[in-house]
Amino acid sequence: MRSDRIKKGFERAPHRSLLRATGLNDGDFEKPFIGIANSHIDIIPGHYYLQEYGRIAKDEIRKAGGVPFEFNTIGVDDGIAMGHEGMKYSLPSRELIADSIETVMNAHQLDALVCIPNCDKIVPGMLMGALRVNVPTVFVSGGPMKAGHLHDGTPIDLNTAFEAVGKRAQGQLTDAELYEIECQACPSGGSCSGMFTANSMNVLCEAMGVALPGNGTVLALTPEREALVRRAARRAVEIAADERFKLRNIANRDAIHNAMVVDMAMGGSSNTVLHMLAISREAGAPLSLRDIEEIAGKVSHIAKIAPSLATVHMEDIHRAGGVPAVLREAARRGGIVREGALTVTGETVGERIRDARTADPELIRPLENAYSPVGGLAVLFGNLAIEGAVVKTAGIQPSMRRFTGAAICFDSQDEAIAGIMGGKVKPGHFVVIRYEGPKGGPGMQEMLSPTSLIMGMGLGESVALVTDGRFSGATRGACVGHVSPEAAEGGVIGLVQDGDRITIDVEARALTVDVSDAELARRRAGFRPKRRDPGSSWLRRYAHLVTNAANGAVLRSTDL
């Protein structure tokens, strides 16, 4: 066992002495040492109860013949960090989480790992760190929260609350109506109830085979979710000494492909593209945006969940058959699902989905009745996004799939929010928010506040938005993000001027600004990208090392 390096031989007597101080005895030194990477934090609704799941996991590991060692990672709640400088820390936290997993696991030479994440950047951060360590690993998330309901039974979620702010600003909601939404949108613990970033990533972990069936859709704080935690912990002990289940053997190129198939079939958060680019690099099987667009062109969009369809939430998809049913339906298009991929349970993907059934064909549609013959995410290219940009097509109104508008430019999210609230944005505008990329922000803030304002103010079918920042999984509308190169590295988005005509064409996979090459060259001659002092040692280091969105916003190591 790997842990023999800290517990075997006379020269490890000091190490054993320290371990005995934690409660270990002679018999424990013959057992596998299992790490539990928890992400309990009180301020995040999807994480405040994870301490109990960690306790359950430790109990099960002991019963199964292992020795558990629980440690914690940090976490950021993107919803609470939204719309202020705190959002600059969200994406960078992914790297800190990955580094912390690598540090604890390798410093102590633990044999296997149970990861208990749930929200936002915590899932990909744990997966990236675990891939570096490459020991047998099982993921089990905290689970999605229930949908909320208004007094008349209308289902709502966190996105309802964000969009309600725009409606209140327009006088379309009273303070009492806004208060009801505020109090009912998030009725329980768990990751926010739609196909937002957290649930998208937990679904993708299930599709990759690094988590047990049900991981993406079983509700938080239920007996069924607790049973998943118990099974995951036991499984980690069972596979601790089995080389076949090293994480890179599970999360390989086929598994990553399957994750992107489910992502396209369910119209996941656009953040998944950013994270899967980064995860694939840690797995040694790097994806490119071109690879992702190729997958998108072959996968039908068969399930719509909030925010794309406001009445459907993760609990509904679970009742309809969950991720196995989505994969099984997608697999009817021969060869699109890599059914031979091994999962952490020891089954192949094909075996896992063989008996899956769709209980509601309106929630998980057959291929013949798909929402679209292509995936719910798309990668766009053009002179405004030479290296690519990402759009969640699942959330775009049909009338906005091809749209040309006059640019109205803002050099920060704060400026954009003030401009939208102040009435500067009119029908026919193409809002440009720049200097919000990984380097420029720094931290690549999510633009949920401005996009929710646009929707809430009734501009969703007459205004589009483009940014080198990113979006919450709750964003809907004609919103294009991840523009690369970003403004801070000299991208064309930094050269756009008010009034320039910008076109998004989803079918053509194009994002262009109607300005000649000669004029762009003239503008570039006098262009100096803006530089912000983030006022933070960590963010300053991050801005120096981070790559652009087309490369997953991973940190470069060549300068170190």
Curated annotation (Swiss-Prot):
- List residues modified as N6-carboxylysine: K121
- Entry note: cofactor: Binds 1 [2Fe-2S] cluster per subunit. This cluster acts as a Lewis acid cofactor.
The entry's family comment says: Belongs to the IlvD/Edd family.
What is its pathway? Amino-acid biosynthesis; L-isoleucine biosynthesis; L-isoleucine from 2-oxobutanoate: step 3/4; Amino-acid biosynthesis; L-valine biosynthesis; L-valine from pyruvate: step 3/4
The protein's role, per its UniProt record: Functions in the biosynthesis of branched-chain amino acids. Catalyzes the dehydration of (2R,3R)-2,3-dihydroxy-3-methylpentanoate (2,3-dihydroxy-3-methylvalerate) into 2-oxo-3-methylpentanoate (2-oxo-3-methylvalerate) and of (2R)-2,3-dihydroxy-3-methylbutanoate (2,3-dihydroxyisovalerate) into 2-oxo-3-methylbutanoate (2-oxoisovalerate), the penultimate precursor to L-isoleucine and L-valine, respectively.
Protein name according to UniProt = Dihydroxy-acid dehydratase
The active-site annotation reads: S472 (proton acceptor)
Asked if the Swiss-Prot or TrEMBL record annotates the protein with the keyword Metal-binding, the reply is yes
> Which NCBIfam families does the entry link to?
ilvD, PRK00911.1
Which GO terms of type biological process are on file? isoleucine biosynthetic process; L-valine biosynthetic process
Q: Which cofactor does it need?
A: [2Fe-2S] cluster; Mg(2+)
User: Which positions bind [2Fe-2S] cluster?
Assistant: C119, C192
Known catalysed reaction(s)? (2R)-2,3-dihydroxy-3-methylbutanoate = 3-methyl-2-oxobutanoate + H2O; (2R,3R)-2,3-dihydroxy-3-methylpentanoate = (S)-3-methyl-2-oxopentanoate + H2O
Q: How does it assemble?
A: Homodimer.
Q: Which UniProt keywords apply?
A: 2Fe-2S, Amino-acid biosynthesis, Branched-chain amino acid biosynthesis, Iron, Iron-sulfur, Lyase, Magnesium, Metal-binding
An example of a Gene Ontology cellular component annotation for this protein is: cytosol
**Enzyme Commission code:** 4.2.1.9
Is Amino-acid biosynthesis among the key words of this record?
yes
Which amino acids does the record list as binding Mg(2+)?
Answer: D78, D120, K121, E446
Q: PROSITE patterns per the record?
A: ILVD_EDD_1, ILVD_EDD_2
Superkingdom of this protein's organism: Bacteria
